[in-house]
Amino acid sequence: MKKITLLLLAMSLSFCTKNDNDAVDNPIDPVENPALMKELTASPDGWKLTYVSPDDSFGGYNFLMKFDTQGKVTMLSDLSATATPTTSSYRTQEEGRGLVLSFIDNNQIHRLADALQGAASIAHTGKVYQFLYTGKEGNNLKFQNLLLGNNASVIFEPATAADWSRTPALYKNITPLTNAAAHYYLKVSTATGTPTTYPIEFTNRVLSLKNTQSKVAVLATEKGIAFHRAFTLGGQSFTELERVAGSVPPVYKATVNGVTAELFYSSVPPNFFDGDDYKDVNTSIEGFALMSQYFKNNEYMTEAFYEDVLKVDASTDLFMLKIMFDGTDDCHIQIGHIFPEKGFSILQISCKYELKNKRLYLKESDKNLSTSAPDVWGDEKNKAILEQAQRALGSVYDLGAQGLYIKKLNIKVKPQEDNPVYLLQSYEFPLYAFPIWGVPL
């Protein structure tokens, strides 16, 4: 009996020891904390959070959050174009480490796992999004990000009603860079020096200049994009780039003390058009011509040009586009089409042209239409073709208003294999580019 009593006593001591250790590791079981909830619900329009890493490993993601006293949080972010907030649950718990805010269920902030790439994505995938409350700084709430384990701070700033209405514009300004980074370049120029153009990478909203050590986290703004910290370019400190009104795809630009930084889109490397192929106009070629059926699937034909200029509908394309030069000044932009039972006919507008800045400029057109077969083009059953031809003529002229770059390509296109092939790209709207035969003199 004595041995049994001693054994039971030993077991009892063992269990007590294990429980004591658990108490040290987690001295306070998680309980709802009304004090933190009170802080979170105090801002009438909620809070805004710029989620960005302190080491430029991922850039700025904008979130708006409005908490209620029933444990619900409504969110909006620049991760999507929607203007409709989404609602999920949250908790404010008192733990051994302090007051913890936990986001429950799926909401805007959980989309970070899909938006981020690499190690940053792994750190945000399949996790409970938790922030440790560390106190107030003025009107702001300060937290430690428990996801990352690097003591990174996140700041909740009081939001305004205007913040909620402008969030879709933030998405609109950042998404072109995210989706087409491979075609964006950063040009840094001064009033006197030769511009320097950098290919870029834009991953996790971090702008990196290729072949350099320069990188900076980026966040969307209502005007364009901003840098998380001052970014030195051309010896000057830049804090933001504004989106140039009307630029498609967007151009982002700023000038500081005579140094201009410009993020611009190009379907080909910027030096692609550095040659003098534009000088072939009126020296070795008298114009350009393409037939849609032979060029629409060419690798150099951009979707924007085909859809907006050449395509009539799902089954019909305009047959031909020509740009013909008459001497050193005059130009004729022509659309040719083959009409059933009526044959081939041309509709054209005339204008002036000029060669400068390595571009072909089209100018001074009255946009008056001329044709030798007005009855054919005016036939009611050809209405869709006429309307598209008019749009095409106007579009080509407008694309040339700020100049068309010209590059002679090392390819042949049947059935005119003997004709040189050129690539023309709009300077103002670089999404509009098209291959075309040169018509030899």
Question: Locations of the language-model features?
Answer:
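Acidic/polar, low-complexity intrinsically disordered N-terminal segments immediately downstream
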Residues: 18-108, 134-138, 142-150, 159-184, ...
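N-terminal glycine/threonine-rich, aromatic-flanked beta-hairpin/loop signature
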Residues: 56-98, 190-226, 299-372
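An anionic, turn-rich surface loop/hairpin at beta-sheet edges
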Residues: 102-125, 227-237, 368-405
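Extended, amphipathic alpha-helical scaffolds
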Residues: 273-441
